[in-house]
């Protein structure tokens, strides 16, 4: 049995929906991961104070005021609480140097998932900087930074800054993808693939999902060879494979949605040249671009000459007459 993982997250008021979702995923992946159920998380005052005494032994300068401040307010890297799921401890990190305190108290010795909510883009930027600093500090350990962003705060430009083991996304898929990426035995190819897949799923990039689908299927051809499966007990392999296939199923649904979205135009393309010209001339630029991607990435299958005409139209659309027959 491998060393049980530990989940860390910044405290939210009460057992929120996010906590319940994360717990459900953890319980499904590995029963040894956490001994609690969603109904028995120790959120009470008695638990918090007893944990405070334990933390003070590690860092004597920790004040009760800082611990009390953890009951909420701003959840920035300077004032926060870490719940150690499975050990029943709470670490309250003071605002001067939370990374240093985390290192001194041994918090970086296990795989760590940092999960939080955001209310502004400024908070996102602050956590990006903090995550980068943490990664540098914990270079010899296996840390995984997970930032869960609401749709309104998704910022693509931050993704590369956090390297391949960080992920912005929806609650369910983000945790799954990040959990996979935390495995140190993954090859660089697999890490890069899973990171890109997570990004595509998160930001609704249907085209990128389609591009990654074929790569993902190759990973599943010989699942027993996957490092991520060798790192966990045999009896859990089926669960992991089911979850991976669920992600790929999501990609297939995305591809199907593209076809459905443009089904009328696609049907028109398969008729006479005149009808074909009328149909594509009436398509918006973005629709035509989606259609081209769908063809080029084998999402749909069209005759070769039809594909040639589609690309020619897209490249020289402004110079075409309404019924002009393309070479």
Predicted regions and their residues:
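Extended, compositionally biased accessory segments flanking or bridging domains
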Residues: 1-107
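Amphipathic alpha-helical interface elements
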Residues: 21-30, 38, 52-53, 95-112, ...
């Amino acid at each position: 049995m491998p060393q049980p993982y530990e989940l860390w997250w910044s405290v939210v008021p009460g057992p929120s929906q996010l906590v319940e979702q994360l717990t459900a995923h953890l319980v499904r992946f590995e029963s040894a991961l956490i001994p609690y159920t969603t109904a028995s998380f120790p959120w009470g005052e008695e638990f918090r104070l007893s944990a405070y005494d334990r933390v003070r032994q590690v860092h004597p300068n920790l004040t009760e005021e800082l611990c009390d401040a953890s009951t909420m307010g701003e959840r920035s890297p300077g004032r926060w609480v870490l719940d150690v799921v499975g050990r029943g401890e709470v670490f309250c990190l003071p605002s001067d140097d939370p990374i240093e305190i985390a290192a001194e108290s041994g918090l970086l010795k296990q795989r760590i998932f940092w999960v939080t909510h955001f209310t502004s883009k400024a908070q996102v930027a602050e956590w990006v900087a903090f995550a980068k600093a943490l990664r540098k500090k914990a270079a010899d350990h296996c840390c995984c930074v997970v930032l869960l962003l609401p749709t309104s705060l998704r910022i693509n430009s931050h993704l590369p800054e956090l390297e391949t083991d960080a992920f912005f996304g929806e609650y369910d898929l983000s945790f799954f993808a990040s959990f996979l990426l935390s495995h140190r035995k993954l090859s660089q190819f697999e890490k890069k693939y899973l990171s890109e897949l997570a990004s595509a799923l998160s930001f609704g990039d249907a085209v990128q999902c389609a591009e990654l689908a074929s790569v993902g299927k190759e990973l599943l051809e010989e699942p027993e060879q996957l490092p991520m499966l060798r790192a966990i007990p045999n009896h859990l392999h089926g669960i992991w494979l089911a979850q991976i296939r669920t992600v790929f199923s999501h990609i297939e649904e995305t591809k199907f949605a593209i076809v459905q979205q443009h089904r009328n135009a696609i049907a028109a393309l398969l008729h006479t040249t005149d009808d074909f010209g009328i149909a594509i001339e009436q398509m918006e630029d973005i629709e035509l671009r989606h259609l081209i991607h769908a063809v080029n990435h084998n999402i749909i299958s069209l005759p070769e000459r039809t594909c040639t005409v589609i690309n020619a139209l897209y490249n020289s659309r402004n110079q075409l007459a309404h019924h002009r027959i393309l070479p």
